[in-house]
């Protein structure tokens, strides 16, 4: 097991990505995950956003990260692929993320669906659309030997039967799952049972606890947690996390 962190943890602290690298070096954390920006953002440009833009040269960034003793475990390219704009916005974004990842030395790219059922599409239509999208994505992923993970975070992916269908879009070894203990819990699922069903397809895990107040207010009504403000072990999901880690 290798422990890292997602730079989302520093969204509210307004860290830059380099400040996250400094934190990782100081605390002896070698692995890091961040989001990818496909374009420019004032917050990122001013150093108030702890993620990376695709215009940043991946080889130069890899060298900078090596100087800090840090490398990527995964990058987050989770534009929802379940809506009508999934093929036209999400697919090109994920493909660029894969190509960039190959140069920066990152082995995995995270993807997901939307939080809600997509407007104007039946569930079957949305699944068909996502299958077509993932087929295009995986062609590029296989060429670059980059794993594409599907994260439980939305309407489809937090339902185990739909996740199973999505993981069966392809038999490629480069299509896997990114487990998330917080998202599955807040969606009303049992994280332990969820992971047990897909443990053979899991290549990366987001470990998130859930506060008692958030669980009481929204469990079974949301499909994901944007940022967890509950430290591990301090919430109602702690025992589930322990069980997941024990396997």
Residue positions per predicted region:
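The substrate-binding groove and active-site-proximal loops of carbohydrate-active enzymes
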Residues: 9, 47-52, 78-88, 230-235
């Amino acid at each position: 097991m290798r422990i890292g962190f997602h730079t989302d943890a520093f969204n509210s602290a307004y860290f830059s990505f380099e400040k996250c690298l400094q934190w990782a070096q100081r605390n002896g954390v070698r692995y890091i995950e961040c989001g990818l920006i496909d374009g420019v953002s004032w917050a990122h440009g001013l150093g108030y956003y702890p993620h990376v833009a695709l215009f940043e040269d991946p080889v130069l960034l890899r060298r900078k990260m090596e100087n800090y003793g840090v490398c990527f475990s995964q990058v987050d390219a989770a534009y929802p692929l379940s809506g009508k704009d999934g093929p036209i916005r999400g697919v090109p974004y994920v493909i660029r993320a894969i190509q960039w990842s190959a140069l920066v030395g990152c082995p995995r790219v995270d993807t997901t669906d939307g939080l809600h059922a997509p407007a104007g599409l039946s569930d079957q239509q949305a699944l068909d659309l996502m299958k077509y999208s993932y087929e295009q994505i995986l062609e590029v992923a296989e060429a670059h030997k980059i794993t594409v993970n599907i994260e439980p975070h939305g309407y489809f992916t937090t339902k185990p039967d739909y996740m199973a269908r999505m993981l069966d879009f392809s038999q490629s070894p480069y299509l896997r799952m990114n487990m998330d203990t917080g998202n599955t819990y807040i969606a009303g699922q049992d994280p332990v049972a969820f992971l047990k069903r897909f443990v053979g397809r899991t290549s990366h895990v987001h470990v998130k606890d859930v506060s008692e107040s958030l669980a009481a207010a929204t469990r079974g009504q949301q499909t994901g947690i944007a940022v967890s403000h509950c430290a591990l072990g301090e919430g109602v999901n702690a025992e589930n996390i322990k069980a997941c880690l024990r396997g």
